[in-house]
Amino acid sequence: MARISKEEQEVVKNKIISVSRKLFNEVGFDKTSTKSISKEAGIAEGTIFNYFSSKDEIFFEVFYSEYFDNVEKGLSRSIENNDIINEITENIYNILKNMLRLPKKVLLEMGLVTIKIAKKKPEFFRKMASIDFKYMEEVQHYLDRLIIEKKLSFFDSRIMSEIIFGSIVYEISMYLYENKMPKSDLKNNLNIKISTLLKGYIIGGK
């Protein structure tokens, strides 16, 4: 790599990520090439490989890093009315919004690319798994706050967060499998499951 400052390197890397995100969204993973990325970014194709080892790695960086950043922000919205189940659903669903704005085709490609990368580079699979664990941890902390605030009676928040995460994975899978299923159905189904899990623990309200 030519001797350029760290700041300039960061600019180039971010440009590659930005352009790649645009192309992946518009034409999909398979029809996007490192050549088309370099052309759109205004750089030599070889420059891309100074920052990423493959198109798969770019794809991972574009979508999973964005999702991780959203998870890192945590679940911070407070309960503002008596409809606690709806508020809990909204808060938990909120982290998923950025990912679900992607076309279903891109989301399916994310799964396929993840499996492909996991076989070649286990460290990327571990990174992906760490995002899921972080999400469950944030849900657990969120439930703990509601217990401390006397919105919910005591239960094992770690186990509950794992069950909720399993429900989320199932609903996302159904959303991707059912071509005509809208995001609103995913959210409503998640609301029903959260209601089933937590309605017996609500203190007052509904």
Where are these regions (language model features)?
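Hydrophobic alpha-helical connector segments
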Residues: 61, 75-105, 160-164, 187-190
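N-terminal intrinsically disordered/low-complexity leader segments
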Residues: 1-11, 205-206
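C-terminal peripheral helix-coil segments that are non-catalytic and often amphipathic
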Residues: 90, 94-101, 137, 141-148, ...
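Helix-turn-helix
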Residues: 15, 23-57, 61-62
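Amphipathic alpha-helical packing segments from all-alpha helical-bundle domains
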Residues: 122-149, 158-162, 188
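Solvent-exposed, amphipathic alpha-helical segments
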Residues: 15, 19-27, 74-77, 163, ...
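Amphipathic alpha-helical segments used for helix-helix packing
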Residues: 100-126, 173-177
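Generic hydrophobic, amphipathic alpha-helix propensity
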Residues: 12-21, 37, 62-66, 70, ...
